[in-house]
Amino acid sequence: MADAYCLTNFIDFSLSLSLPLKHHNRIKYTCFDISDSYIIFGASSGSLYLFNRNGKFLLLIPNKHGAITSLSISANSKYVAFATQRSLICVYAVNLSAQATPQVIFTHLDQSVQVTCIHWTQDEKQFYYGDSRGQVSLVLLSSFIGHSLLFNMTVHPLLYLDSPIVQIDDFEYLLLVSNCTKCILCNTEYEDYKQIGNRPRDGAFGACFFVSPQESLQPSRIYCARPGSRVWEVDFEGEVIQTHQFKTALATAPARIQRPGSGTDELDANAELLDYQPQNLQFAKVQRLNDDFLLAFTELGLYIFDIRRSAVVLWSNQFERIADCRSSGSEIFVFTQSGALYSVQLQTLQSHAVSLIQQSKLLPCANLLRQHVRYFADKAREDYELKQLNPLKQLLIERQEYELLNDISVIFDAITQCTGSALDTHSSGGSSATTERSLSGGSSSRAPPKGVYVLENAFCDNLKQPLKTGHFKDALLTVTGKFGKNIIKYKFNIFAEEQQQLVRELIPASERSLPFKDIKARYESGSEDQEEEIVRRCKKPAPQVPHISPEEKTLYNLYLIAKSAKFSRTQCVDRYRAVFDEYAAGELVNLLEKLAQVMVEHGDTPDQAQRNCYEMYFDYLDPEMIWEVDDATRDHIAAGFVLLNTSQNAEIVKCEHCSFPLRFDTSCQYHELGAVLLRYFWSRGEQLKCFDVVQSVPALLDVLAKFYLAEQNLTKVVAIVLNYGLPELLADVGKQLSVSAWGRCFEQFVELQRGGRLVCANCECISGVEQEQLGRHFFYNWNCFLNIALDHMSAGDTLALIFKWSSYIPNDAIDREFYSRCLLKG
């Protein structure tokens, strides 16, 4: 089974950090970094504060060049690069000698530029930095031969991007740069640059290399954060392999830091009852943690992912206003906006439990086991090391922690199964006796003394040897007659009410010979003074209920949601969003096809069922996901879009030569989805697919007009604008039309008014249109057309075109208000 993890070894460095600043209340720490030897802080005063990894203050490095905004320490801890608010990039050579004068060299940058990130290479003499202008530069350091004393630094610009740099990482000759719109992979050896993925984004998202220690078993990868709690997995050629979606997986309870005496067991018990929503997050920085995990953070939480399994390891909201994080091995350092620093360690639950035992913290260990009973029970059957937990049982009996012992007894039974040896079973209370039983088949058991009740251990029936004469099964507890049945009843009430469900999940029903309720009933009905015998009872098999698979339940629930939405005429996307989030794109398409069959079985026509399923899908679908789904899913979306926008009653006037739409209804369902679909096809050079969609859904011609406008194909732009017949489209396109283009538009508008002739946007041939078709919309009159033209041209140019075509303009076609606007515009 997969390991479960927790955050342990919490350290608060607040006291250590406050000592150097105790006489300087106005100075604040602004940024930090760590190495194997040091923790270093930049401050608002411009100085550097150097500590060892235990938090002991070592050295103050003064600096008079302004507050420090970013810093990074080299891998060998010899140099610290930092940037200041006054647009300086500086390097400090670490020297802890009391007699040495701190050596800092610097170079000036453009005053309008701020450094946003710094990254050292494995070579101690060079580092990269990115700035707010989008520029990435390489800094080379020079030092005296054989000494760490610096005497020069040179800056070499490498990349000029379109937005501020967010994160930089490198591996050998590869450089990875993430800015606010995209990720760039650079081969510095061949000066080759490639954008990762095709879809731009907006915001700070990080990216990093994840180099595998065993390349043959698991290849190295690049991981890029994406909007909506997604992560791209990318190979070293810059090709996106897959997208990991963690939005739904993060709808779990946050992990609490394991601290003795913190009461996390009670808090975690309450946390399980809460309903956690999916998290839509933006990760501005991602980094490697240990050899297996990816660490990310937001202002409100830490997030650890196992990308290889596409799983969330844990997330924690125990820190407030996180400013930055660093990882070192399994240790995580968290720096907050208030200037505080904390560290925690990522450990498996198993390792943490063993470490608590080794530190003689037995009661905290028992509470940890109770929080994660199922995990430890499964682990105990696999791992012999957990036999170290056995001392817990004696401690709990001595302290009379019977409830806690009952809660975790399944773990001790599993340890017995793993070790193959019998556990001593202790009596409850201070005067409890011990009944020893042999597991060997040849030995016999003594009958218990009068007043001692031996209760069958329902957890371990499958571990027992076959019964022989005089044998008793393993007992969970042996209880002297002094305590009677009340304490036994109390214990099994706990089992019946709190752990019955857990036992059913862990032990198959066929292996539980005596249910809890039968045990409980016998002790309630028996006499306190009489010796009782527990008899194996055979339960009559319950009548079989028709089995319904989880998928069938899901389909039925979706059908009920769709039916209620149909009658209430409301959107119910929030009710089925959580269901859809659990499926990959291809799986979701298959699910909807099965849902359509269910709708047909309940009386819908095949066409209506298909439309209903498409509407549910499109209400849920983010149009931007079209860029990331596979081709089959994308074609499915295109087919559904055409189906929903195809009406038998729609009146479309088509070209006489090529049957391309000329006049049509401009209403469109899911227009944004269709626009993204066209943009995808057009960007891939698949213009034929664009025209197939547009011919079926001509309301998307406004999107096509903008494509042609970008290519300066004004003939098609003007044709589409006049055919589309919406003032909003002409007003939008008119911003980019020149005076000559407006002249061409005037010419075609005159032809339209004179004879009802439209130019086909496909074949560019002229076709006649009935005047009734033209008079249905306000756009096709001179007042509307000229007022839009006046918005984008000078009054003189507009009047010149009117004068040119005045013989074709009716006398009463233009209102006085238009001429008044011309006079006001000058």
From Swiss-Prot:
WD repeat segments: 22-61, 63-102, 110-149
Entries under InterPro entries matching the protein: Beta-prop_HPS5-like, HPS5, TPR_HPS5_insects, WD40/YVTN_repeat-like_dom_sf
Span list, region Disordered: 422-447
A Pfam family this chain is assigned to: TPR_HPS5_insect
Disulfide topology: none
Keywords tagged on the record: Pigment, Repeat, Sensory transduction, Vision, WD repeat
Distribution of this protein across tissues and organs: Expressed in eye pigment granules.
GO BP terms in the entry: compound eye pigmentation; developmental pigmentation; eye pigment biosynthetic process; ommochrome biosynthetic process; protein targeting to lysosome; visual perception
Domain of life from the UniProt record: Eukaryota
Phenotype of null mutants: Flies exhibit defects in vesicular transport to lysosomes and therefore can alter eye color.
GO cellular component labels: BLOC-2 complex; cytoplasm
Single GO MF descriptor: pigment binding
Biased composition (Polar residues): 422-446
Keyword Repeat: yes
General function of this protein: Has a role in the biogenesis of eye pigment granules. Eye pigment granules are specialized forms of late endosomes or lysosomes. Biogenesis of pigment granules in the eye requires molecular components required for protein delivery to lysosomes.
Miscellaneous field: Pink was the second eye color gene identified by Morgan and colleagues, mutant flies were isolated in June 1910 just 2 months after isolation of the first white mutant allele. Another mutant allele of pink, peach, was isolated by Bridges in 1913, and according to a review published by Bridges and Morgan 10 years later, these alleles represented the first case of multiple allelomorphs described for an autosomal gene in Drosophila.
Family per record: Belongs to the HPS5 family.
The protein's name: BLOC-2 complex member HPS5 homolog
Organism: Drosophila melanogaster (Fruit fly)
Gene name linked to the record: p
